[in-house]
Amino acid sequence: MITSIHTLVYSDDAPATRAFLRDVLGWPYVEDAQGGGAGWLIFKSGLSEMGVHPTHSVYDGKTYDSPRHHLISLMCDDISHTVAELKGKGAEFHGEVQAQGWGLMIMMAVPGADDIMLYEPRHPLAYKL
């Protein structure tokens, strides 16, 4: 039986990405000495849920197309508070918080890796099941 989801971030600067997850996001971790020596960290990322979005859809008369891909998003209870807290720890964000139908979102820069979406959901939460 499936017990959890393990996500991977491929980084051009793995030590910087790991430091961001450890020091800025404050995620607890285990060290995997078999994964490549000291500093190979696996993080506890909290509760999770998974949604499946179509690559083509029409909503409110607008057409949306997206290539097949996977996306990592971090959820929070209060996006304004979370953004301010993370900025205080050195996190950088692109643009302003945007209202979407499913929640409030902003893209967060991750050192050495692609951005991660931070959002305050406005949809039912599956991780509480």
Language-model region placement:
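Short glycine-/small-residue motifs
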Residues: D115-L118
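Conserved active-site tyrosine of GNAT-family acetyltransferases
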Residues: T17-V24, L86, A113
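Vicinal oxygen chelate
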Residues: M1-I5, P28-L74, H81-V110, E120-L129
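Conserved beta-strand-loop-alpha-helix junction that forms the acyl-donor binding cleft
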Residues: S11-D13
